[in-house]
């Protein structure tokens, strides 16, 4: 697999999964554009000194103008990988409109706007878009106790499938991965008694994403790929 200096945007690239995705992309020759929330996040990014990493401070990706500025600064975009998001769990009685809108904004609206900008940037050349859904987007009953999160990720999955059909003739392949619980330090702290060995590792999920975004991947569109490990 060779990206050969192809430009790739990775939102959420400074997170645990994002760091693994960026590292894997760098290993196959990509130039990675990583928007960070703050200057401090950019300064702390482990790959910041790699010349093939282009960091920026984008602010809120649910803001259309901010997203358009981000994509306008990337030449000849090949792939856009949308990892930025957030998780909140609460019973519906404790889920007010503010929490619902927060989950929709960080998970669905930000991804929608990035997809929209990516399609515009790829016009006439084709490319790849990879989103991140969740197990709750595919197995609705698993979203009990986190209805706002589950709804936001289900909307993202529907977006992925619908957009894949819309842009297929433009040679833009749109897919998503749907993790269960990824093995990250934060998840281990949150669930100290869980079976960590059953969780998919960040490098394993990253490998799936990098393939879906690659020029070697030619045929799959509209897939929401379960990446559950044994969890």
Roles of regions detected by a PLM:
Residues 6, 76-77, 122-134, 169-172, ...:
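Active-site loop of short-chain dehydrogenase/reductase
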Residues 14-15:
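Conserved glycine-rich cofactor-binding loop
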Residues 169, 176, 184, 194-231:
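C-terminal helical subdomain
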């Amino acid at each position: 697999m060779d990206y050969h200096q192809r430009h790739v945007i990775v939102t959420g690239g400074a997170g645990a999964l994002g760091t693994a995705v960026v590292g894997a992309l760098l290993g196959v020759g990509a130039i990675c554009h990583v928007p960070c929330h703050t200057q401090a996040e950019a300064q702390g990014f482990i790959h910041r000194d790699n010349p093939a990493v282009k960091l920026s401070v984008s602010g809120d990706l649910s803001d259309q103008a901010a997203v358009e500025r981000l994509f306008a600064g990337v030449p000849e975009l090949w792939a856009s990988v949308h990892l930025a998001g957030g998780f909140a769990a609460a019973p519906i009685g404790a889920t007010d409109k503010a929490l619902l809108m927060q989950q929709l904004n960080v998970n669905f609206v930000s991804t929608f706007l990035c997809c929209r900008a990516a399609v515009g940037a790829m016009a006439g050349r084709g490319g790849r878009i990879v989103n991140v859904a969740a197990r709750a987007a595919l197995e609705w009953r698993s979203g009990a106790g986190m209805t706002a999160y589950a709804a936001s990720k289900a909307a993202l999955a529907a977006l992925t499938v619908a957009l894949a059909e819309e842009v297929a003739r433009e040679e833009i392949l749109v897919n998503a991965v749907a993790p269960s619980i990824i093995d990250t330090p934060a998840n281990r702290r949150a669930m100290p008694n869980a079976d960590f060995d059953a969780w998919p590792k960040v490098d394993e999920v990253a490998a799936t994403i990098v393939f879906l975004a690659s020029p070697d991947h030619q045929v799959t569109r509209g897939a929401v790929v379960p990446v559950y490990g044994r969890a």
